[in-house]
């Protein structure tokens, strides 16, 4: 793939030249990811799942135009996850757009064992309680002991599984049937695991 890809950004060039060899380095340097090929190169085993397919209409000068609206989640099931939305009159293009956006939105997720009931020290849950919000949806993710599983809605479970989380409790509020907002709220909560330090990192 590197032979065909002509990078347009500094980060892309560093990846092609082999000066950056891992996705961890990208986030350690706080460099923005603007090319999907960077993700394809550094996270080749990425999995994607279509979370929702809807139909939306918008008004144009020539009348109403109907489009597919798709939400996709991507992850390597080992600490990286992204969520994206795409719209198009063709379902295949909408899925492709959503997948590209999800890849560009990919973030690292800090895993741990934050439950006082467990304390096994393995990265099966999250290190501390986090919350995320999108639209009217708010979700709280709470560390759970080993064996509890993912106590969450199906949409939240998919995003958590793609991030590599195996055990978590959750509480959600608002219009939780809105798939995109639910997925985005979980994504926003998981982002916070990386933004804040847990006591063992002080």
Swiss-Prot record:
SUPFAM superfamilies: dsRNA-binding domain-like, Ribosomal protein S5 domain 2-like. Transmembrane segments: none annotated. GO terms for biological process: translation. One of its GO terms (cellular component) is cytosolic small ribosomal subunit. Coiled coil: none annotated. It comes from the Archaea. InterPro entries: Ribosomal_Su5_D2-typ_SF (IPR020568), Ribosomal_uS5 (IPR000851), Ribosomal_uS5_arc (IPR047866), Ribosomal_uS5_C (IPR005324), Ribosomal_uS5_euk/arc (IPR005711), Ribosomal_uS5_N (IPR013810), Ribosomal_uS5_N_CS (IPR018192), Ribsml_uS5_D2-typ_fold_subgr (IPR014721). Keywords: Ribonucleoprotein, Ribosomal protein, RNA-binding, rRNA-binding. Residues 46-109 form the S5 DRBM domain. Gene3D superfamilies: 3.30.160.20, 3.30.230.10. PROSITE patterns: RIBOSOMAL_S5, S5_DSRBD. One of its GO terms (molecular function) is rRNA binding. Part of the 30S ribosomal subunit. Contacts protein S4. Belongs to the universal ribosomal protein uS5 family. HAMAP family: Ribosomal_uS5_A. The N-terminal domain interacts with the head of the 30S subunit; the C-terminal domain interacts with the body and contacts protein S4. The interaction surface between S4 and S5 is involved in control of translational fidelity. PANTHER family: 40S RIBOSOMAL PROTEIN S2, RIBOSOMAL S SUBUNIT. With S4 and S12 plays an important role in translational accuracy. This is Small ribosomal subunit protein uS5. It comes from Thermofilum pendens (strain DSM 2475 / Hrk 5).
